[in-house]
Structures are given as C-alpha cells and as structure tokens.
C-alpha cells in the first residue's frame, strides 16, 4: 500500500528528503577561504608547472584563480622548491593578489614541510610517504615492537610541523592515496579502505594529542567504489571518535575527456548527496583550469552552489515544434553570463509548462513558427520563433534581472 501524504511528511528518514543535509564539520581557514559545513563547498585544483619556474607557476596559479579556483595546490618535492614558493607568493602579491596556496609534500618531507609552511596557507602530507621506508620484498610481517618504533618515529618527525602550523594558524591536509599506503598498513589491513582510514587516523590522533585541529582529510583512489567506501568509513570513524574535520573529495587519476568527468562526478556527487564533503577537486589529464567548470557544475546540479544559469530543456521528440538543439544553444550563448537564473526551453506545450514550472523563464513551442514566453508559471506573450530569443532577453531586462556580458 502506498504511503499517505501525512505518513510521508512525518517520516524522519532523510532518504526521501529533497534537501542535502551536510555532515556537521568544523571550520578550517585556508588563507581566508573557510572550509566546513557552515560554508559553501569549495573548489580546488593544482597547477602543473614546475614550482622552480617561478614565473610559470605564478601564471598558472593566476589562470586557475581567474577561472574560479578558490584554493590552489602546487608540488614541493625539495627544499629548493619550498624556497621557490616564497618567491611565487611575492610575485602574486606584486603582480596579481594573494591566492590561498597548498603545498604538496611527499617522500620524507619533514624539512621541506617545515620550510614551505612559512609561505603557504596549508600543507598537504601523504601518510604513506611522509616517513617513508622502502618496501622489503623479503618481509612477511611486522612485529609489535617494530610497529611501535615506526609510530614513535612518525610522531617525532610530524610534531614539529604540527607545532609550526599551529603557531602560524595555518592548515594541514592529511591526504591518503589508495596507491601509496605504507607497507605496514598493507600487512595489517591489506589494500583496503580500512587501511586508508587507519593511515589517516594515525596522524589525526597525533594532531589531537597536540591540540591541533585545523585539519582537512582526503581519501583518494582512482576507482570510485574504493573512494566511496573510504570516505564513508572515514566519516563514520571520525564520528565514533568525536572528530568533525572537513573532507576534501576527489577521484584521483580520473583520466580525461567525457569519461574522466563522468568518473569524477560518480564519486564526488554521490558523497555530496550523502552530505559528505566540504571541498572538491576534479582531477583531469587536461589543463587544470578545465577542471573548474566541472566542479561548479557538479555543485550546481545537486543544489549546493548556484554560480551559473540552470538550463532546463527536454530531449526533443516528434511533437517538438522547432529545432530544439539550435534554440537551446542560442539561448545559452545569449544568457550564460547571468548568475542565479533558471531558464527552460521546451519543445511543445504537452509537457513543457508543467516540467518547467520551477523555472524563472520559459521558452515553449506553441505552434508552427510560434513560441510562448513564460515568467514562472505565467504565460506572458506569444512571438514568432524568429523573435523568440530576443524577446526572452527583453523579458529578463524588463524584470531588472539582466546584466551585460563582461
């Protein structure tokens, strides 16, 4: 038997809720950009220039920031690179503006992290590589004493970085990668989401012991199912232990083209819809600035941020009274610079008015060569198809919702 409306409305389950209820997370400040559940889901990316190329890296950061990237990461594999970051920050101040920067530090990066922490707003470390020991092919197990010794060495090397970040009120990302778990984690947990979570929690607990909480956590994998499981388990584990750190979402090494975008969306949007995630990156094998529109499209498609026009259009059928694809493109070309509007382009009046009822404006086929313009649910006027796009623009202008393109 179908549920009654009263039963539906009284249900406490969020499974049927049209709103996304974000997991409550603390606020982390990254160069003035606030990450956490009280703030918009943030968009990040990473330059692909060599950090030693100060001018090239500065230009890459600027391109990303101008494209809408809110936090930019750059690789710092050596002390020389760490010092170059200071020059990059200076060049940004001189030629553009300060941009929130994250330094990516990997293999045995203790000294590198301490140096670059003086320049950037956040340091990202990989728990599997921060204190790195080459895998021993002859090893069959780790003794309890060996594990304790490794943990002691990790704490000894990690604490100075935590102390510096705390003193400077800067942030840390504990960024686990599925493909680079430490050997002892692989022995203990296998190549699993649990191993990823335990890798992160080891560092989280050290931070907690030092009363440092300006932390963001990521659980990246190149396969979406692994990434999904790891983030869910990480959130559950933090909840059980009383931690509420923000999550940085991403499918690493997603590839390029349509499939890379689809693969990233499958992982990122799924978690966002579950309320997990406070900042995202879509990793594509393309120019970094091409990642940014994908991020904003994901966020808009599930209602977390609105930064562009939302276009609603039917797939076309035998009832369509004009070239729908051509008209949609004309409308998009004329209005894509606007922010916050919903515009529907529907091929006929059979389903058009109902399916576009939530739109701010509608363009609907009325008859051969004739279209109707709508404001919300109200039909405003009929015009010839040749005048349709211009008349739609005029209607938006009449309502005071038009701005000229930049």
Curated annotation (Swiss-Prot):
It comes from the Bacteria. It holds the Pfam family GcpE. InterPro entries: Dihydropteroate_synth-like_sf (IPR011005), IspG_bac (IPR016425), IspG_bac-typ (IPR004588), NO2/SO3_Rdtase_4Fe4S_sf (IPR045854). One of its GO terms (molecular function) is iron ion binding. Binds 1 [4Fe-4S] cluster. Keywords: 4Fe-4S, Iron, Iron-sulfur, Isoprene biosynthesis, Metal-binding, Oxidoreductase. [4Fe-4S] cluster binds at residues 314, 317, 348, 355. Its cofactor is [4Fe-4S] cluster. It catalyses: (2E)-4-hydroxy-3-methylbut-2-enyl diphosphate + 2 oxidized [2Fe-2S]-[ferredoxin] + H2O = 2-C-methyl-D-erythritol 2,4-cyclic diphosphate + 2 reduced [2Fe-2S]-[ferredoxin] + H(+). Converts 2C-methyl-D-erythritol 2,4-cyclodiphosphate (ME-2,4cPP) into 1-hydroxy-2-methyl-2-(E)-butenyl 4-diphosphate. Belongs to the IspG family. This is 4-hydroxy-3-methylbut-2-en-1-yl diphosphate synthase (ferredoxin). It comes from Prochlorococcus marinus (strain MIT 9313).
């Amino acid at each position: 038997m179908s549920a009654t409306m009263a039963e539906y409305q009284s249900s406490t389950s969020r499974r049927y809720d049209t709103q996304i209820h974000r997991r409550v997370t603390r606020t982390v400040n990254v160069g003035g950009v606030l990450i956490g559940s009280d703030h918009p889901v943030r968009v990040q990316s990473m330059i692909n220039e060599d950090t030693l190329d100060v001018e090239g890296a500065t230009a890459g950061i600027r391109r990303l920031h101008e494209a809408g990237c809110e936090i930019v990461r750059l690789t710092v594999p050596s002390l020389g690179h760490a010092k170059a970051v200071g020059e990059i920050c200076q060049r940004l101040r001189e030629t553009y503006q300060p941009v929130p920067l994250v330094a990516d530090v990997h293999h045995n990066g203790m000294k590198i992290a301490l140096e670059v922490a003086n320049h950037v707003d956040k340091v990202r470390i990989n728990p599997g590589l921060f204190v790195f020991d080459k895998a021993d092919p002859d090893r069959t197990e780790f003794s309890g004493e060996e594990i304790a010794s490794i943990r002691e060495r990790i704490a000894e090397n990690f604490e100075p970085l935590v102390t510096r970040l705390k003193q400077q009120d800067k942030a840390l990302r504990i960024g686990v990668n599925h493909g680079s778990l430490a050997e002892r984690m692989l022995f203990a947990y296998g190549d699993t989401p649990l191993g990823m979570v335990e890798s992160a929690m080891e560092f989280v607990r050290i931070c907690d012991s030092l009363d440092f909480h300006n932390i963001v956590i990521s659980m990246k994998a190149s396969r979406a199912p692994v990434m999904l499981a790891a983030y869910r388990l990480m959130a559950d584990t933090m909840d059980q232990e009383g931690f509420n750190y923000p999550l940085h979402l991403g499918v690493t090494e997603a590839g390029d083209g349509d499939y890379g975008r689809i693969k990233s969306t499958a992982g990122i949007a799924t978690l966002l819809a579950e309320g997990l995630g406070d900042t995202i990156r879509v990793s594509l094998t393309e120019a970094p600035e091409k990642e940014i529109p994908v991020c904003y499209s994901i966020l808009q498609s599930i209602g977390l941020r609105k930064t562009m026009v939302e276009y609603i259009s039917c797939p076309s059928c035998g009832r369509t009274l004009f070239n729908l694809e051509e008209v949609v493109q004309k409308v998009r070309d004329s209005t894509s610079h606007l922010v916050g509007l919903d515009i529907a382009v529907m091929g006929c009046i059979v389903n058009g008015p109902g399916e576009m009822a939530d739109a701010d404006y509608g363009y609907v086929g009325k008859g051969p060569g004739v279209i109707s313009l709508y404001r919300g649910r109200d039909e405003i006027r009929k015009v010839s198809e040749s005048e349709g796009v211009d008349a739609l623009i005029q209607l938006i202008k009449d309502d005071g919702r038009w701005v000229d393109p930049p």
